[in-house]
Amino acid sequence: MSPQTETKAGVGFKAGVKEYKLTYYTPEYETKDTDILAAFRVTPQPGVPPEERGAAVAAESSTGTWTTVWTDGLTSLDRYKGRCYHIEPVPGEEDQFIAYVAYPLDLFEEGSVTNMFTSIVGNVFGFKALRALRLEDLRIPVAYVKTFQGPPHGIQVERDKLNKYGRPLLGCTIKPKLGLSAKNYGRAVYECLRGGLDFTKDDENVNSQPFMRWRDRFLFCAEAIYKSQAETGEIKGHYLNATAGTCEEMIKRAVFARELGVPIVMHDYLTGGFTANTSLSHYCRDNGLLLHIHRAMHAVIDRQKNHGMHFRVLAKALRMSGGDHIHSGTVVGKLEGERDITLGFVDLLRDDYIEKDRSRGIYFTQDWVSLPGVLPVASRGIHVWHMPALTEIFGDDSVLQFGGGTLGHPWGNAPGAVANRVALEACVKARNEGRDLASEGGEIIREACKWSP
């Protein structure tokens, strides 16, 4: 039975429940170079046609609501509406399909990841006509990319600042993550940097707690950096976590880091928020600080296979919002990561131009034009025996971040750092000599053990 409608006197206006596909499903539409394109994995409620559900996603994430409203006549829906322009099945999943949606660029505020996500994913994921919804990928048009500053410095500028070339960078997260005093924390930082690491790191939940206030930590870490630099002749850094309860406090911590003369600060970009992250990124570029990004909370958003957002979308958003490093998974180690899929979004972080490649999860060709690249950080559950695989998989433009793989060395922190550095240099040397790291990795590490703790 058709829904009841009410006619407004004199204007011929009809209210009532409308099928979304009548307005928002447009398979004949040819996408524009300026459109933001989205690929959604849709799991509809039983009995609902794919065209209607795909159109509903386009409508509820752009101009639509459940009925026609009289103010529709005061604007041009054809100019501003999102369009579901293509639907394809998901192989092996009878109840799922991919809906491709095109959004006009005028729907989004320039230079605002916050506004982009508020529009595309802010409301539609709670739509009861859908059992589940996942944003698999976005195509960001060049016209929109150019409204963002992006990373504060990028890969090449970071290497020039550090004067380190031809190999991955080495890092270590200080453990235990919580409970150390600032002085003992600084001691661990010094031992790791003195042993040969390029960076050490605050854990994501180290902010300013009663056992270690942020200012004390910054001071002792700066002392460790300068002492290790003087003794090794290398430029060193520690990711000082500036994440705070307010943007004002976050910037205050970054200002203090700059006054100490340290090279890099850190931010938890998902828990801190994109507005805060973009603000910090702008400050870092203006003041010569590198910015390390941790993705704490990402698995809440990206781990479910049929609901939420894939990490490649969060990675693209970070490149737009700004960060010089971001944690990206390891493929090896204790956290999840499929090799081809992980390398797909690693390339989206580093490269200027990435072709569509569905085998790697890349739904759209992405052109970043002149936006600087981001170094992927491989971390969590890795140690020296993973070094050949990590060197082969991630290449030179990466940060290999060890925690227990450094601090868990039976001889102490400094020998653990020495072991990491010796293993890395052995793998890079073997690779440059043409040896196969995949098949000879164990032998390469055993040879290196003769010259390392």
From Swiss-Prot:
What is the recorded post-translational modification? The disulfide bond which can form in the large chain dimeric partners within the hexadecamer appears to be associated with oxidative stress and protein turnover.
| Catalytic site | K175, H294
Q: Where is this site: Transition state stabilizer?
A: K334
Recorded hits in PROSITE patterns, A to Z, give: RUBISCO_LARGE (PS00157)
Protein's UniProt keywords contain Magnesium = yes
Where is the protein localized? Plastid, Chloroplast
Q: Which residues form the propeptide?
A: 1-2
Matches recorded under InterPro entries: RuBisCO, RuBisCo_large_chain_AS, RuBisCO_lsu_C, RuBisCO_lsu_C_sf, RuBisCO_lsu_fd_N, RuBisCO_lsu_N_sf, RuBisCO_lsuI
Q: Which residues carry this modification: N-acetylproline?
A: P3
Molecular-function GO term, any one: monooxygenase activity
Record EC number: 4.1.1.39
Residue(s) carrying N6-carboxylysine? K201
Q: Which UniProt keywords apply?
A: Acetylation, Calvin cycle, Carbon dioxide fixation, Chloroplast, Disulfide bond, Lyase, Magnesium, Metal-binding, Methylation, Monooxygenase, Oxidoreductase, Photorespiration, Photosynthesis, Plastid
**Which positions does UniProt annotate for Mg(2+) binding?**
K201, D203, E204
**Catalysed reactions, semicolon-separated:** 2 (2R)-3-phosphoglycerate + 2 H(+) = D-ribulose 1,5-bisphosphate + CO2 + H2O; D-ribulose 1,5-bisphosphate + O2 = 2-phosphoglycolate + (2R)-3-phosphoglycerate + 2 H(+)
- Enumerate the Gene Ontology biological process terms: photorespiration; reductive pentose-phosphate cycle
The note describing how and how many cofactors are bound reads:
Binds 1 Mg(2+) ion per subunit.
User: Where on this chain does substrate bind?
Assistant: N123, T173, K177, R295, H327, S379
User: Domain of life of the organism in this record?
Assistant: Eukaryota
Q: What else is known?
A: The basic functional RuBisCO is composed of a large chain homodimer in a 'head-to-tail' conformation. In form I RuBisCO this homodimer is arranged in a barrel-like tetramer with the small subunits forming a tetrameric 'cap' on each end of the 'barrel'.
Identify the NCBIfam families for this entry. Answer: PRK04208.1
Assembly mode: Heterohexadecamer of 8 large chains and 8 small chains; disulfide-linked. The disulfide link is formed within the large subunit homodimers.
Function description: RuBisCO catalyzes two reactions: the carboxylation of D-ribulose 1,5-bisphosphate, the primary event in carbon dioxide fixation, as well as the oxidative fragmentation of the pentose substrate in the photorespiration process. Both reactions occur simultaneously and in competition at the same active site.
Family recorded in the similarity comment: Belongs to the RuBisCO large chain family. Type I subfamily.
Q: Which HAMAP family match?
A: RuBisCO_L_type1 (MF_01338)
Stated name of the protein: Ribulose bisphosphate carboxylase large chain
Which organism is this entry from?
A: Galium corsicum
